[in-house]
Amino acid sequence: MTVNPITHYIGSFIDEFALSGITDAVVCPGSRSTPLAVLCAAHPDISVHVQIDERSAGFFALGLAKAKQRPVLLICTSGTAAANFYPAVVEAHYSRVPIIVLTADRPHELREVGAPQAINQHFLFGNFVKFFTDSALPEESPQMLRYIRTLASRAAGEAQKRPMGPVHVNVPLREPLMPDLSDEPFGRMRTGRHVSVKTGTQSVDRESLSDVAEMLAEAEKGMIVCGELHSDADKENIIALSKALQYPILADPLSNLRNGVHDKSTVIDAYDSFLKDDELKRKLRPDVVIRFGPMPVSKPVFLWLKDDPTIQQIVIDEDGGWRDPTQASAHMIHCNASVFAEEIMAGLTAATRSSEWLEKWQFVNGRFREHLQTISSEDVSFEGNLYRILQHLVPENSSLFVGNSMPIRDVDTFFEKQDRPFRIYSNRGANGIDGVVSSAMGVCEGTKAPVTLVIGDLSFYHDLNGLLAAKKLGIPLTVILVNNDGGGIFSFLPQASEKTHFEDLFGTPTGLDFKHAAALYGGTYSCPASWDEFKTAYAPQADKPGLHLIEIKTDRQSRVQLHRDMLNEAVREVKKQWEL
């Protein structure tokens, strides 16, 4: 009787992933991927999350890896199944999230000969993956078992090496595909990890930073801009640096510097609104900017930095690459944020720096927020109030996942700094509106804590399939559906002036009744008519297992003018108080 080599070959493959610290596999049903799926399910150190739809599965894995900050296996059968991972792989590439894609494939003799469910899977994801290989067909020799273990270690290491990102291993398999679980699939040839891949913090010596340190020591008018941050230590060190330099921090919501129990005295949270005013920009123009992480959501900040090349920009990016869409940076420094902050602070003199510059920013920010609160609309159709109310209701130590298009921009505008500890997530790599529901589900599974998802109606429609995870896994997900019946962001863009074709090409109303989606996936549903009703609907459900859908119906046309009028009035009041 011929021994099927799949059991020990794929068993060694999966076991080495577990030895590399991987604890989760997202698996899509399929025949050719049987040994990968079954041996993941049988491994005592790997949790399997079954997702039926491959596109949703890809984004679920993305959210899971984003929450855990370590690689997740993503497994599917051969054919178009793998192609459905493409959007999630692209997002993982640009947001630097480690995913290990394992695509089962037909053996070489069945490729390019018209065999069913066989497509060319070589380099399927192009340059969006950091590493690709087509593994050898299963053999049970000691040499081949060492080979497949080494390949697993390498794939895990490549995914975690900075900048982190997706990798792809194509796995050709011959029938029979069912492994023999009674034959010690993980024990044979387990003599320890054959390749131990370690990554560390990227550092830079003080001498290399001498010119930057000297510039910062002399520049009193500076500011710190923070994009998405992952490390609490980095946050604390950036705050310490801002206090030492007396620089304001323009904190993107994804920096998570606006929320939490840390010191927020130097954090500025209303900049996206008041930096739209040219006079305020002139009064608050810095000589130097230190930017940590990717470019923030705020378009006014981006345009300000892009259009004024005389501002000295210092970009700190530990992961390498070139994240500077302004094309105006003077210094690109590839080192850890905490290392940079500590080195700069160590070189500062003990002399007390003037706080006048920082106080200007604090004054404008404080007056703007105060005035905006006095003119807020009680109309439930005004979306801005949602975020000001929600930030005080999100359960502590839970997560807030924010959809792209208008939701993340409204969070940037209306989300104030406050002490409630929770984490904000969003898919800002490629900024797509697809896969957002599934990404939020993955974060929920990864954190083992409730998630509140704020999402627009078109984005919600894109990923309705993702809601199945809430029902199957009992995930505590509250979806706040901001339904303006179409693409609300286009009403703020020049396309809105094209009246003849605007609704058909850009507004794209669907007219869908989303309460049926809640029923389909066994969730609760409410559609509050006031903000008091919203609070009553949200608070009791936010940390309970299952799907809870709260629909906020808004009006695209009226919100544009109301939004602009409110912000313009607040800016006018600030300028009056500042005697501009």
From Swiss-Prot:
Signal sequence region: none
Keyword terms of this UniProt record: Magnesium, Manganese, Menaquinone biosynthesis, Metal-binding, Thiamine pyrophosphate, Transferase
The yes or no answer to whether the keyword Nucleus is present is no
| Disulfide bond annotation, renumbered to this chain | none
Cofactor(s) needed for function: Mg(2+); Mn(2+); thiamine diphosphate
Q: What's a single GO BP term from this record?
A: menaquinone biosynthetic process
Entry EC no(s): 2.2.1.9
What is the official name of this protein in its record? 2-succinyl-5-enolpyruvyl-6-hydroxy-3-cyclohexene-1-carboxylate synthase
Q: Which organism is it from?
A: Bacillus subtilis (strain 168)
